[in-house]
Amino acid sequence: VTSPENPAALENPATLLARAVVASLVEAGVKRVVISPGSRNAPLTYALADAAQAGYLQLRVVVDERSAAFVALGASRSDWLHEGLARPAVAVMTSGSAVANAHPAVVEADAAGVPLIILSADRPHALVNTGASQTTVQTGIFGAATRYQADLGDTNASGAVANQVRRAVAAASGRLSLDPGPVHLNVRLAPPLAPATPWQVPHLEPKTHWLRARKPLAAQLNGVTVSQVGCRLGLDPARRGVIVVGDNDDAELAHYAAALAHAWGWPLLAEPTSLVRTNANAVAAYSALLAGGDGSVGGDGAQLSQEIEQLLVVGHPTLTRPIGALLAREDIYQVVLTNRARWSDVSGQAAYVTTLEQALSSLNIPGGGAGAEAGADADAGGDASASAAAGAGAGVGKNAPSPLWLQRWLQAGQQQLNATSVTKAAQMALTTWQATSQYESHSQSTAIHSDGLESSVTLMAASSMTIRYLDAGLPAGKQLKKMPGPVVANRGLAGIDGTISTAVGLAWASGQPVRVIIGDLAAAHDLTGLVKAVTENEVDLQVIVLDDHGGKIFSGLEYGASELSNYFLRFFTTAQQVDFAQAAAAFGAHVSVIDDVDGLQSLLSETIEGRSLVHVKLV
């Protein structure tokens, strides 16, 4: 019965369904939504706007669905990086090809384990496969990449909708599965699509218990030492070991890797996005060293590699071939420590795979709850006694490592770094990183670095040569006077698309400045990520384009061989005709053009305000 006392009874079904979806998202802990304009998703847009007006959501409008999905991915990454909360951001779009445009971000989120919700509007079931306009089969469009999918529209019952939304949020967050990633909610909406009545948004209670939260390492240890955990993993402090840390977004795993390296005197072979590359045990130029680079006290890099007896692997190490070769060796005892149900072990050589929580629970040491600080303090002093190893069930190796084991690695890495010739592009990339590490921001928000220090700016690197320039040229951590902020890259599938848009999401969600370092091809892929609707707030984003006229990553691979040169320029270098300065200016970004290190250093010392692009001409 319709009556003024029951406003909902006057409302159309599409609007009621959209409001139920939005209310359920808010109560499940969702905070940020990226909206791409469209007709079929209009009911969702109205409901989201009302919820934002009521203070429950933060919205950003991005016209391109491909870019919008990457912006949402960046926002999700920001929450995990800065807040330790696996809170999925949402990308909302209309039906048809708009949904397919989210696929690149979805597969990156799948491979990287980033929470993400794709909320697509759809036509009613009756219109599918009839030739109706802007209608395709959207259910299952992302295939095996999603952790959960639901088709909403058969009922407007708020309880049924809330049930599906909560499941989607929990699945995206990895709350129960330890497998965070993308989910797809497909909402079927029939006209009328505009609301008939204003929505008086009810009191909603956002709950974070649907979201996975990162637990501080000290609280996890709860009096147990990192050495005891290491021994429980089957690692032996008396044998020569190395810790490999690939792309990693979990600060607690980074803390553990750094603490064990300190306690046992093991070197860290850490990628720039590992969160431990600036640790005192991190080895400079480790990849070149493993490939047989310049020597050290007691042997060259290849000799050091042959002396490794055991490996602890953390994160997703895919950046360099020498690390891949190291992880493929059958003569090294390897342990993978992960925080997810999926782990990296490309060659299948891992003897043991576990989470930190599982390792701690299996110890079951009496009195382990005596206090987290005791465990942390013991390891700070290098507690790696044989008795602790024996007590954790690990034997002591016959060949105790020399106390110089770490020093040999650090010295060899430094010698390799000193001997490495630096290209102009690499010099520009390293200059950008150095300036970013010294950047002072007026922002009130800061990011907690894995070593417990704070920084106010994030560096986003494209997954091509730029991240490799950093990997090859960053100094050892012990040489740093100030701890830089985190380095982020889309290393899930290591693609170059979406880099700028992801950085927009990082800057939007964190409220902090973000600097992007990117090559010309990767920039051309995602230059429209700089587009901003006139109604949207600015983000503090600076994009440094290292323009060496094409993709130079292939020149260092087998495709760059002289006998294949007839193919190389057209099919691999693929230089583009793009005037980055004019294009960025057309999108409303401030533009600078430079061609030398001095000019770059001067520009990088300025405050990052609004959107800007620096075109660095290398050729």
Question: How does the language model describe each region?
Answer:
Residues A18-V22, V26, S39-T45, P403-G511, ...:
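Active-site diphosphate/adenylate-binding microenvironment
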Residues E108, P115, L119, A126-T139, ...:
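Thiamine diphosphate
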Residues A69, R77-L81, N101, Q228-C231, ...:
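Glycine-rich, anion-gripping cofactor-binding loops and their flanking helix/strand elements
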Residues S120-Q164, A168, A270-G371, D379-A386, ...:
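Glycine-rich, acidic loop regions that bind phosphate or pyrophosphate groups
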Residues V1-A28, A162-L235, P401:
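Cofactor-/ligand-binding subdomain signature composed of acidic, glycine-rich
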Residues S36-G38, T94, N186-L189, V244-D250, ...:
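Structural motif
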